[in-house]
């Protein structure tokens, strides 16, 4: 079975073909236009998707060495995401499915991220046979949930203000780094001292001693942004430039340590021995290393997607559609689908 996946939820235009559960093409076109603005401009993102969608889909089909008529299913992100951006991909998928007389499967973007760790050409380890804890962490989302084998979810924690990826990008902007700042901070931090300055870890046992906070799996990163801004304002530009790698490492440690701490604590509280980490921030080298070390200490299995599947991509959309079809969790015949506003667990 050949499934075409389409992803346009933010600033990546992507199309992929999954054949019998294995990725055989995955084309991603990142929109560089947003760098000049220090963040994604929704209207520009939608226009870029409109400009790129045909060529990206054609490239994915050609790389798969098939014809469009060989496709069995069309799958597309139906949200959450930037509404205009989502609608470009979803409407294109609707039209393509209708023209080819193929079924259409709408896919939840967050759900696809959760299962991106199990894309077959990426992971040697099989998916866990029992429930697992999922940390989904990106520029727009930071969420912990329990994933059941019937593809149902229980959200146990989420950000109450800013997402972790946004914290990376906004603090990077304060430091004068290019957008997206996450990968730049990751590179700088390799040369820096993560203990150079202790930035706050909100909603953790380090910030409060009461049991309610130790059992709280929500996240908060707005205070970190304020702390970084205050730190920068009390030092001259020469000092900041001289210690840029140390500051980057300290910011990164403040973000990743909270993600690791809460994810491990959730697994321990609920007696679950498997964790998956996905989303754009899962590409961060410090997060991957720290989470692996913590899981090894606790005897927990860790599943993280390869770097290409960490950020937004259509392979995860097609793979999620394939999984839902295999488990009878979707009816792929509705051309009149509306975008999802959120992830419900």
Swiss-Prot record:
In alphabetical order, the GO MF annotations are: iron ion binding; N(6)-L-threonylcarbamoyladenine synthase activity
Gene that encodes the chain: tsaD
Predominant location category? cytoplasm
Residues bound to substrate: 136-140, 169, 182, 186, 284
Residues binding Fe cation, per UniProt: 109, 113, 312
Localization per Swiss-Prot or TrEMBL: Cytoplasm
Function in brief: Required for the formation of a threonylcarbamoyl group on adenosine at position 37 (t(6)A37) in tRNAs that read codons beginning with adenine. Is involved in the transfer of the threonylcarbamoyl moiety of threonylcarbamoyl-AMP (TC-AMP) to the N6 group of A37, together with TsaE and TsaB. TsaD likely plays a direct catalytic role in this reaction.
What family does the database annotate? Belongs to the KAE1 / TsaD family.
Which PANTHER family does the protein's record reference?
A: TRNA N6-ADENOSINE THREONYLCARBAMOYLTRANSFERASE, TRNA N6-ADENOSINE THREONYLCARBAMOYLTRANSFERASE, MITOCHONDRIAL
Designated name of the protein: tRNA N6-adenosine threonylcarbamoyltransferase
List the source organism.
Prosthecochloris aestuarii (strain DSM 271 / SK 413)
Keywords, ordered alphabetically: Acyltransferase, Cytoplasm, Iron, Metal-binding, Transferase, tRNA processing
């Amino acid at each position: 079975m050949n499934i075409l996946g389409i992803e346009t939820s933010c600033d990546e235009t992507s199309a992929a073909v999954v054949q019998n559960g294995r990725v055989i093409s995955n084309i991603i076109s990142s929109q560089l236009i947003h760098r000049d603005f220090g963040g994604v401009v929704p209207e520009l993102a939608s226009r870029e998707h409109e400009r790129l969608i045909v060529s990206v889909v054609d490239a994915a089909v050609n790389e798969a060495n098939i014809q469009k008529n060989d496709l069995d299913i069309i799958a597309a992100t139906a949200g959450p995401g930037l509404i205009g951006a989502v609608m470009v991909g979803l409407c294109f998928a609707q039209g393509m499915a209708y023209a080819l007389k193929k079924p259409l499967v709408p896919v939840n973007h967050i759900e696809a991220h959760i299962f991106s760790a199990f894309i077959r050409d990426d992971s040697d380890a099989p998916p866990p046979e029992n429930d697992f804890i999922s940390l989904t962490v990106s520029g727009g989302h930071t969420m912990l949930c329990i994933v059941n084998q019937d593809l149902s979810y229980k959200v146990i924690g989420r950000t109450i203000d800013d997402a972790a990826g946004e914290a990376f990008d906004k603090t990077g902007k304060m430091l004068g780094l290019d957008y997206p700042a996450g990968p730049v901070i990751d590179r700088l931090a390799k040369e820096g001292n993560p203990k150079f300055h202790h930035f706050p870890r909100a909603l953790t046992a380090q910030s409060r001693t009461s049991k309610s906070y130790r059992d709280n799996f929500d996240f908060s990163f707005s205070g970190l942004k304020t702390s970084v801004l205050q730190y920068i304002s009390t030092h001259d530009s020469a000092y900041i430039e001289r210690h840029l790698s140390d500051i980057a490492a300290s910011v990164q440690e403040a973000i990743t340590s909270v993600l690791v701490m809460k994810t491990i604590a959730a697994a321990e509280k609920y007696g679950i021995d498997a964790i998956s980490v996905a989303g754009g921030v899962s590409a961060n080298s410090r997060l991957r290393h720290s989470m692996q070390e913590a899981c090894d200490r606790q005897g927990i299995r860790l599943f993280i997607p390869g770097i290409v599947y960490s950020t937004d991509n259509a392979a995860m959309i097609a793979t999620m559609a394939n999984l839902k079809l295999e488990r009878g969790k979707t009816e792929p015949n509705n051309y009149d689908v509306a975008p999802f506003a959120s992830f419900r667990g």
